[in-house]
Amino acid sequence: MRTLTESRRRQSGSSGCKKDSESDDDENTICSRAAIKRSVVYYLKNSTLHGLKYIAEESITIPERIFFGLAFVLVVILSVFFISNVYVKWSASPIIISTSAKQKLTSNMPFPAITICNLNQALLSKVDRIGRTSTNFSLLMGLCDQGGDTTISYIGTWKYFKAILVDVAQPCEKMLLYCSFGSREEDCSWLFTSILTDDGLCCNFNALHPSYLIRNYSDDVRLETAHPNTRYELIDWTPEKGYARNLPEFYFPRTSGGTGIRMGLTVVLNASIAEYYCTKSMSVGFKVLVHNPAELPKVSNYGFVVTAGREARIPIEPVYEDALPTIRSIKKSVRRCLFSDENDLAYYRTYSRKNCELECEAKLLLRECSCVLYYLPRIDPLARVCGPNDNQCTDRVQTEIESSLTNLSCENCWPGCFELTYRATLSTASIVSDPRFQAGENLPEYIFHGPYSNASEISILHFYYMTNIFRSTTKSEMFGFTEFLSNTGGLLGLFMGFSIFSVIEIFFYITVRPYCASRTLRQRHKRRLEQLSWLTPIRMPVRRALRRNRGGLLRNPPPPAYSDLQKFRGKLDKPETCKRKLWRTLQVRPVVDRADEELPTYPYLD
């Protein structure tokens, strides 16, 4: 009897999900099927989603409920279909390139870097002093693409090759006769510096100083002796960051002083046709390239030619591409552009597509030919410079890189998200040096009447902006998360009346409501135990009566004393409910002879 009583006490005091069939309140247990069904019906009737309340409506017939249920399923399928179309469009083309609504000033952009190369790569007077059987002559012939002795296995350093090129090429002070910028004549040596390109030694204007362009810069990179420039201060500039806020009065690279020929760059060049020895073209004159100040030029393939004896006008239009910071969250393979801090180059400090392609070409040559061409980035300080014996290998690699049809390609060099390029057009006319011809150009007289008065050897170039404003293009998100969310929410609201509050409702009915119901049941069970705690002293008389009647059957166990019940009368429930609770708490199951015999009654509980 005691074991049975303790077992029933544990069963009645558990807070699990088992339902006690003898308790009216336990029928509301949260884990019961009936409770779950009632919760689902309650949600359907009170949900903000369209059509669900008709499924749970009891006043309509079952076919009508089925109709609304199928309609709701169809609406969900249509919503998923249209949302998937929006997602495919969002994931396939997340970037849109649009014209900026705000115009930019050319004065906020650097004037383009201009590289000018004489088509003659070696002066005849300098070559005559080199022995025809020497290694230097063979290297020179390799530079001129005239073969040379390809049996010579040249193993030299970049410093040695640089010395040969500087020695035989036309220096900038001999090529540049006159320079003016911003309507002011200036010393050409202050404006132009020597630079090595794929066309040999050239003269460059307005490029970044090598200390801002190259990592691990040293004086070995310099081609000429540095001369102090007390007027212009060298500063850093990148397409992404632009100029610093506080700029000196005179700085380099320079910005445009205005529009038109007078405010642009004007140079007078001397071709020195009598000194021509070798050239990569079939004409005499100059090859010119307009490029970004933060990039090294490749003049051989991309420069335009101005023949000697011609005057050229070259109007320039800047083309600037920027990007919004929001596209950083998009994968690189999707947006197809890189920010400056996302792909550091080994040799250059500033990332651009052309700088990346130069490094890529150097790496491929080093891998395939075990050497690097003299004008390419020296990614390996110990790598040798390619000589005449490497021409066959270097030509093959460069052809494959430019064709982009083989494994030797630089497809991973994506454009920068911020890039500045320049669009230049060329128009030329013949120079007339007849003294009877009255020229309107504000050029010095000594150019036409001095030692370089031969008009057939002179070229005049004018670089200038046509306008001081331009429009840039901006890369931005075509579909940001906000746009995707609004499109999705619009479709769900159109088909189902869905909103953020619908999500809150679902969360409430799955988590908050079951928790609150379970907590309420536990509190109700706890109060019930407190109400029945007064029956504990009453059990002793009953047990003594059981021991006295151990020999017979206890038909009706004696009830507790009436005086013990009197003080707890305020806690009693309804009479019938209290009788059943009292009988279960006593844990005494009477032995009955007939199955239909009624439970014992306690009249004083009324």
UniProtKB/Swiss-Prot annotation:
GO terms for biological process: cellular response to water stimulus; drinking behavior; liquid clearance, open tracheal system; response to water; sodium ion transmembrane transport; sodium ion transport. Disruption phenotype: Flies do not exhibit any general drinking defects, but do exhibit markedly reduced water-elicited proboscis extension reflex responses. Abolishes water-elicited spiking activity of water gustatory neurons. PANTHER family: AMILORIDE-SENSITIVE SODIUM CHANNEL-RELATED, PICKPOCKET 12-RELATED. It comes from the Eukaryota. GO terms for cellular component: membrane; plasma membrane. It is a multi-pass membrane protein. This is Pickpocket protein 28. Osmosensitive ion channel that mediates the cellular and behavioral response to water. Plays an essential role in gustatory water reception. Part of a complex that plays a role in tracheal liquid clearance. Probable role in sodium transport. It comes from Drosophila melanogaster. The keyword Membrane applies. The gene is ppk28. Its main location: membrane. InterPro entries: ENaC. The lineage of its organism: Eukaryota, Metazoa, Ecdysozoa, Arthropoda, Hexapoda. Expressed in water-sensing neurons in taste bristles on the proboscis but not in carbonation-sensing taste peg neurons (at protein level). Expressed in the tracheal system. One of its GO terms (molecular function) is sodium channel activity.
